[in-house]
A protein has these predicted regions:
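Acidic-glycine-rich active-site phosphate/pyrophosphate-binding loop
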Residues: 114-127, 218-229, 405
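Short, solvent-exposed loop/turn segments at the edges of secondary structure
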Residues: 84, 119, 162, 194, ...
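Acidic/histidine-rich catalytic neighborhood of metal-dependent amide-processing enzymes
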Residues: 131, 136-216, 481
């Protein structure tokens, strides 16, 4: 899908041309960022996450952005570990322009060549088809750096950036966003006090073929289910059949939560879920989505016969996923041992009208009753480790209308308004704390493999993302002024 930005007639031709001209240097900037393995989930990589924050701050300062690194203190679950800072930035103080808060994150998921990557994940590789392969290219270093590239393009084109920008870049998004909500509350009437809207680019199109702008996200409730049977692992030959085994209980409980067709088996969980209208169903079937895109390039087997049913399952209905069962004893013995303690991990994605507190009560009650019915001698502990409610935003606001027009300007097509099956807790935090409209602006594709091996970004998409940012700010300025005139 080619860009038509240079022919958009929106007054940004010089900016668009400069983006194309600077493409090589922009790829080199991304290459430098990918080299830094800023994996927030690993304590041994924390120094690299800090190094990434300093690198971004340096790049921003070179472009004239006012930068502050806000310390977030110690990590809640690892008090000896320092949290990476929020990188806060400010570009522009013009009262004749809107002020847009841009959120992104500079940490990434773990990656290693032995995981099955085609290339070293920490070395940016350009494939023959122009796709950029490397950890963070699509999530979220690529989209983040796109904003810096946009500023540079405006500067070198001799054109003013159409809006004031406030940046909020975090380094713990892939590991619980520890400290972020508190920081937002602290800065709501300080660093963020004069913002007009929020823009988050940590989302993707509904398919490689169908451009979209999501206005809703599912919520998430994450559980740790611990079953303890002994103080240490035991040999199954010596103690099998003699002692109570945690794995037996764990498998029984985990398998009772959801069936093989994806139906959640916890009673009452669907009671408040909104029904899907006939119009919605028909519109979902009309979307231009290939089977590969619908399945995110995973090669998975779909549970649904129609595209509409698949999208409804992702956007409009809750889901329960079993993630893993872990032996809680590090370096536990042979594969035939009986684990002393197990931790089962699962999560529930929630949709509009579902309340996390109510769902948690249903889940806790169901699991405890199920465990009681087993007559087990083991001990059970249920920990709701994390929860965030669903998010839904008005697309009538000038923030969304600016993004819709910008997509038309750059890509030459009308984006469809959709929802996302994933969860971005920070979107709801921004909406609740700052009381501003929050835009979800996609610049990537579902087959980019953001959290999987061979994570990549489409080369043309990366360049058009920069153009999209600029056009979005241009349209935002126009619509903001109109809204102030008619207010």
């Amino acid at each position: 899908m080619a860009s038509r930005a240079n022919a958009a007639g929106d007054g940004l031709t010089g900016f668009y041309s400069k983006v194309d001209e600077l493409e090589t240097s922009f790829i080199e900037r991304l290459e430098e960022a990918v080299k830094i393995p800023s994996v927030s989930a690993y304590a041994e990589r924390r120094e690299d996450v800090f190094r990434m924050s300093e690198w971004i701050a340096s790049e921003m300062r070179e472009l004239g952005v006012e930068v502050t690194l806000k310390p977030l203190g110690k990590q809640q679950d690892k008090p000896d570990l320092e949290l990476p800072p929020l990188v806060l930035g400010r570009y522009g103080h013009d009262i004749e322009k809107p002020t847009v808060l841009v959120y992104s994150h500079y940490d990434v998921q773990p990656a290693a060549l032995e995981d099955g990557w085609k290339y070293d994940p920490w070395v940016l590789t350009i494939e023959e088809n122009g796709r950029l392969c490397g950890r963070g290219t699509s999530d979220d270093k690529g989209p983040l750096i796109g904003w810096l590239n946009m500023i540079e393009s405006f500067q070198k084109a001799g054109v003013e950036v159409p809006a004031n920008l406030v940046f909020c870049f975090e380094g713990m998004e892939e590991n619980g966003s520890f400290g972020l909500r508190k920081a937002l509350e602290e800065e709501a009437q300080n660093f963020f006090k004069d913002i007009d809207v929020v823009c988050i680019t940590d989302v993707v199109w509904v398919s490689d073929e169908q451009l979209s702008i999501p206005q809703g996200l599912r919520g998430i409730i994450f559980y740790l289910l611990t079953i303890t049977g002994a103080e240490r692992d035991a040999h199954s030959g010596g103690f099998g059949g003699q002692i109570s085994e945690p794995m037996t209980d764990m498998v029984n409980i985990m398998s009772s939560l959801v069936d093989s067709n994806g139906k959640i088996l916890v009673p009452g969980i669907y009671d408040t879920v909104q029904s899907v209208t006939k119009e919605e169903y028909e519109s979902y079937n009309k979307l231009n989505i290939s089977e590969d895109s619908l399945l995110g390039g995973t090669g998975a087997r779909s549970l649904h016969k129609t595209q509409a049913d698949a999208l409804i399952a992702r956007w409009k209905k809750p889901s329960l996923s079993l993630h893993r069962i872990e032996n809680a004893t590090p370096g536990a013995g042979a594969v035939t041992s009986i684990p002393a303690k197990l931790v089962g991990k699962f999560s529930i994605r929630t949709v509009p009208n579902m309340k996390s507190q109510d769902i948690d009560k249903l889940v806790q009650k169901y699991i405890r009753e199920k465990f009681e019915s087993l007559g087990s001698k083991n001990e059970l502990d249920i920990n709701c480790a994390d929860q965030s409610d669903w998010f839904y935003e008005s697309s009538d606001h000038w923030n969304y209308q600016a993004a819709i027009q910008a997509t038309q300007n750059v890509w030459g097509v009308d984006p469809v308004l959709t929802c996302e099956g994933g969860s971005i807790p920070i979107a709801l935090d921004f909406k609740q704390i700052l009381q501003k409209n929050v835009l979800l602006l996609p610049v990537g594709r579902p087959t980019d493999g953001a959290h999987t091996i061979n994570g990549l970004a489409n080369g043309p998409n990366s360049i058009n993302a920069i153009k999209l940012y600029g056009s979005y700010l241009q349209e935002a300025q126009k619509l903001w002024r109109q809204s102030n005139t008619t207010a």
